[in-house]
Amino acid sequence: METLSQDSLLECQICFNYYSPRRRPKLLDCKHTCCSVCLQQMRTSQKDLRCPWCRGITKLPPGYSVSQLPDDPEVIAVIAIPHTSEHTPVFIKLPSNGCYMLPLPLSKERAMLPGDIGCRLLPGSQQKSLAVVTIPAEQQPLQGGLPAEAGAEEPDRRGVVKSSTWSGVCTVILVACVLVFLLGIVLHNMSCISKRFTVISCG
């Protein structure tokens, strides 16, 4: 594999999107890496996966999906490194009880540990107005194993296709309505202009 910078190691070199739980870094037989979404798109147009760089072929047995290809362990190791500092604790104010919570490590299901374990009260003078920040799944670091959503990659993709198809249909209908409206205005103005000339010439 070529020598890549740290940033280019974190993104798919086909679509230039960062790797995420939805865009997992998949290792081809030739040892090149692509995201699972790009490989899935390649798979729809060809039987076997052909590497875009070296043209090496990765054969998938019948019934195998792209999600069953191995993850690239080097990329997973880089992505899984936590980026928070031990010297800057973050407290989150819980709206339900006014408690300030120190976030604890996430479980495999990406859920906070339950109960008072994660709740640390601060003295009144140190309490600040903080809000919970939700990190999109695209930007969350990958864990070592496959996420629970990996098996649901196909239905998720179908939902996106249905959604984009529906928005395309709505766009076409909206454009057609606007064109009919504008045509109506033009025809109305033309009929008014022709009547005005008729009245003037007759009168």
From Swiss-Prot:
The keyword Disulfide bond does not apply. Signal peptide: none annotated. Keywords: Lysosome, Membrane, Metal-binding, Transferase, Transmembrane, Transmembrane helix, Ubl conjugation pathway, Zinc, Zinc-finger. CDD domains: RING-HC_RNF152. One of its GO terms (cellular component) is lysosome. It is found in: Lysosome membrane. Disulfide bonds: none annotated. GO terms for molecular function: small GTPase binding; ubiquitin protein ligase activity; ubiquitin-protein transferase activity; zinc ion binding. The keyword Chaperone does not apply. The chain crosses the membrane at residues 167-187. Its EC number is 2.3.2.27. It catalyses: S-ubiquitinyl-[E2 ubiquitin-conjugating enzyme]-L-cysteine + [acceptor protein]-L-lysine = [E2 ubiquitin-conjugating enzyme]-L-cysteine + N(6)-ubiquitinyl-[acceptor protein]-L-lysine. A zinc finger (RING-type) spans 12-55. Pathway: Protein modification; protein ubiquitination. It holds the Pfam family RNF152_C. It is a single-pass membrane protein. GO terms for biological process: apoptotic process; cellular response to amino acid starvation; negative regulation of TORC1 signaling; positive regulation of autophagy; protein K48-linked ubiquitination; protein K63-linked ubiquitination; protein monoubiquitination. Gene3D superfamilies: Zinc/RING finger domain, C3HC4 (zinc finger). InterPro entries: RING_RNF152, RNF152_C, Znf_RING, Znf_RING/FYVE/PHD. Belongs to the RNF152 family. E3 ubiquitin-protein ligase that acts as a negative regulator of mTORC1 signaling by mediating ubiquitination of RagA/RRAGA and RHEB. Catalyzes 'Lys-63'-linked polyubiquitination of RagA/RRAGA in response to amino acid starvation, thereby regulating mTORC1 signaling. Also mediates monoubiquitination of RHEB, promoting its association with the TSC-TBC complex and subsequent inhibition. Also mediates 'Lys-48'-linked polyubiquitination of target proteins and their subsequent targeting to the proteasome for degradation. This is E3 ubiquitin-protein ligase RNF152. It comes from Gallus gallus (Chicken). The lineage of its organism: Eukaryota, Metazoa, Chordata, Craniata, Vertebrata. The gene is RNF152.
